[in-house]
Amino acid sequence: MARGPGPLGRPRPDTVAMPKRGKRLKFRAHDACSGRVTVADYANSDPAVVRSGRVKKAVANAVQQEVKSLCGLEASQVPAEEALSGAGEPCDIIDSSDEMDAQEESIHERTVSRKKKSKRHKEELDGAGGEEYPMDIWLLLASYIRPEDIVNFSLICKNAWTVTCTAAFWTRLYRRHYTLDASLPLRLRPESMEKLRCLRACVIRSLYHMYEPFAARISKNPAIPESTPSTLKNSKCLLFWCRKIVGNRQEPMWEFNFKFKKQSPRLKSKCTGGLQPPVQYEDVHTNPDQDCCLLQVTTLNFIFIPIVMGMIFTLFTINVSTDMRHHRVRLVFQDSPVHGGRKLRSEQGVQVILDPVHSVRLFDWWHPQYPFSLRA
């Protein structure tokens, strides 16, 4: 009599032997790579079956190596702890700390090697330095530079900047824009431009007479500025004079002129050193009126002005006059500069009030109406 399947019979070939009670599930690296996936590999697995929420390092490393090999990348490029985040059960296999140490050493060696290559590449680039062209090439190119592009041209390299310091550069620039019908002061005429002293300043002044883009800039200045000029703060008053203007009006007007020396940009930025022109071209770059400007205020009446020469100009306001038809100008002078946005009291310093005012104009040293010495 044949026996049926039962506890006394042999197990069928297609049945799988169940693990004994009390045995834990074991995970091996080759099992993870072969595509076998169990419930313990998922984050939402049953806590009764999987007691730990941490994936074993060996399993993570094995899966990471398998994925990277499929993607054509090296497994050491990504930390193993960030590769997987799932739940796993503690197992009895050997600790993978040695593998992690070896992996970290490999990453460190690759990082050091990469830094050395980057440093070597940077040294090669620094050592190359590009091509250095002779000064004659830059002087030839400078003949095609517009006056408003001189600054950009000088910033290309040191040789280009040196070319803009030469007397030949400024002489050629003057001849290129000079016309016979140009109305120029005596100091800016061709026979006076043979002097090397103040050559650069004289050429710049002449361009505001001859070069149309520069002349158009100064022709747009209104009689009364739209906003109060703020560039004169902490400027030193070098000179003051007034003169009587006789025009079409029945009563003459009075013109009050204040010559100021602006605070040097180097002092504002606390930078004492800067790029200086070559010694042989110092006369070309000499300019007694450098950083100077002229404040010209025209009034309808004569107004007594106290002595302010040598004092520091600290406050400048333009308001509407009391008759609501003209403007009122208030100037405040101090013995020392005012820094840090400190406010002044009304009784401090010397105040100059001009009212009624017909026009207020501010001329830089290159402006055609700026008075400069013929000896410059």
Swiss-Prot record:
Transmembrane segments: 300-320
Keywords assigned by UniProt, alphabetized: Membrane, Transmembrane, Transmembrane helix
Membrane topology: Single-pass membrane protein
Main location: membrane
Region entry Disordered, spans: 1-20, 100-127
Subcellular location: Membrane
Gene Ontology annotations for the cellular component aspect, listed alphabetically: membrane; SCF ubiquitin ligase complex
Family per record: Belongs to the TMEM183 family.
This protein's name: Transmembrane protein 183A
The gene coding this protein: TMEM183A
